[in-house]
């Protein structure tokens, strides 16, 4: 399923036009709340917003690349820089969403115990670990992909591959024997594991809501808020990571579906700010999972 280059261009540009200002607003709102009281959810939201902002900045270049049918438009040394700037936030976003979901679940299932131990510095440690994991994996993969290129003067250098038609292609012409297992490991560790954590936490939040004394309307709203991270993972990041699994099983399935998955992944910069809920001046609703206990209402 190959999308027309013009449609791919329009989708990337639209994601940038919507996602860039939304993430600026989300970061601004989170910073405003952090000045009053820094919480673990705010730490995750700030990292997710900065991650999505970096991803959004790369989308115009991705749009130009799509319009040129995959040809790399910049000087060759910029390819690995673009690869890190584009794919690091694409993978890190799943980890931050899982961390947000875990905080909601712990706040709902163990309100008093979690309130006693939650500290922003622990959340900073989690965020640093997520960034380190993503960057180390991407750096290792890029290093392995380019390490032999200096000995093979025919095509490849710094992630660039020159196909037969002479057009430079950044990363997409990566040696399939190296690309398939590397992308599969990325997806298992940086998508499917966060997806399982997010799904488990979502079910836990739903169970806590069922036992709560909230009105039906507030239960529905809280359930929607808790499920936002899971929805973003499935709709935006799911297709791209599913294509990595499919291409590992059957190499003929990877190409066109991977391009479509990259487009849906780009739209995570639009949905993530809506999930975190710090776009306005009011409370960050996106970080709340509410449960009613005998002593009152606990919010995370």
Curated annotation (Swiss-Prot):
Protein name per the record: Free fatty acid receptor 1
Query: Which regions face the Extracellular side of the membrane?
Result: 1-8, 65-79, 143-178, 249-256
Q: Which residues lie on this side of the membrane: Cytoplasmic?
A: 32-41, 102-121, 201-223, 280-300
Q: What happens when the gene is disrupted?
A: No visible phenotype at birth and during the following six weeks. Male mice tend to develop a slightly decreased glucose tolerance after 13 weeks of age, but this is not observed with female mice. Insulin secretion in response to glucose is unchanged in mutant mice, but it is not potentiated by fatty acids, contrary to what is observed with wild-type mice. On the other hand, wild-type and mutant mice display the same inhibition of the first phase of glucose-stimulated insulin secretion after prolonged exposure to fatty acids or exposure to a high-fat diet.
Topology versus the membrane: Multi-pass membrane protein
Summed up, the tissue specificity of this protein is: Expressed in pancreatic islet beta cells (at protein level). Expressed in pancreatic islet beta cells.
What keywords appear on the UniProt entry? Cell membrane, Disulfide bond, G-protein coupled receptor, Glycoprotein, Lipid-binding, Membrane, Receptor, Transducer, Transmembrane, Transmembrane helix
Q: Where is this site: Important for receptor activation?
A: 145, 172
């Amino acid at each position: 399923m190959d999308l027309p280059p013009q449609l791919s261009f329009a989708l990337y540009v639209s994601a940038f036009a919507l996602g860039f200002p939304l993430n600026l607003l989300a970061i601004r709102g989170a910073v405003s709340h952090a000045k009053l009281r820094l919480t673990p959810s705010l730490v995750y939201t700030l990292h997710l917003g900065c991650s999505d902002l970096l991803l959004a900045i790369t989308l115009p270049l991705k749009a130009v690349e799509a319009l040129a049918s995959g040809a790399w438009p910049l000087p060759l040394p910029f390819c690995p820089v673009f690869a890190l700037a584009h794919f690091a936030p694409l993978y890190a976003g799943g980890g931050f969403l899982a961390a947000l979901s875990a905080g909601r679940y712990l706040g709902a299932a163990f309100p008093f115990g979690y309130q006693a131990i939650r500290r922003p510095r622990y959340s900073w440690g989690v965020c640093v670990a997520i960034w380190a994991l993503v960057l180390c994996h991407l750096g290792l993969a890029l290093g392995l992909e380019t390490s032999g290129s200096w000995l093979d003067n025919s095509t490849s250098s710094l992630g660039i591959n020159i196909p037969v038609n002479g057009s430079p292609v950044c990363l997409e012409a990566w040696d399939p024997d190296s690309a398939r297992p590397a992308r599969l490991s990325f997806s298992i560790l940086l998508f499917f594991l966060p997806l399982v954590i997010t799904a488990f936490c979502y079910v836990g939040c739903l169970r806590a809501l069922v036992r709560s004394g909230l009105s039906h309307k507030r239960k529905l709203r809280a359930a929607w808020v808790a499920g936002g991270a899971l929805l973003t993972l499935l709709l935006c990041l799911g297709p791209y990571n599913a294509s990595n699994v499919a291409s590992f099983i059957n190499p003929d399935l990877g190409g066109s579906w991977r391009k479509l998955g990259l487009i849906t992944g780009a739209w995570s910069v639009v949905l993530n700010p809506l999930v975190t809920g710090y776009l306005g001046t009011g409370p960050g609703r996106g970080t709340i999972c509410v449960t009613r206990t005998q002593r009152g209402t606990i919010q995370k």
